Design a protein with these regions (language model features):
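A conserved regulatory-domain signal marking ACT and ACT-like small-molecule sensing domains
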Residues: 1-69
Length: 69
């Protein structure tokens, strides 16, 4: 999404509120657009799907997807 102050904080808090651990994060910014890749530790698909739904509701988040299995 568009780069905005506090984006990493908002995403990290959202993940934490779902009782999910962040294993790693990689963020790149190109022309005021930020792309964040999180590796998270979840207990099951239900927890992951709930996290994805919550993340998509954050300010200026355009897209959230599961990258791998």
């Amino acid at each position: 999404g568009q780069d905005y102050k506090g984006a990493l904080k908002d995403m990290s808090e959202c993940i934490s509120k779902q009782n999910v651990n962040i294993a790693s994060v990689d963020i790149t910014v190109k022309e005021s657009v930020s792309i964040a890749h999180f590796i998270v530790q979840v207990n099951n698909n239900r927890q992951l799907n709930r996290l994805i739904r919550k993340m998509t509701k954050l300010k200026n988040i355009d897209y959230v997807e599961r990258a791998g299995r």
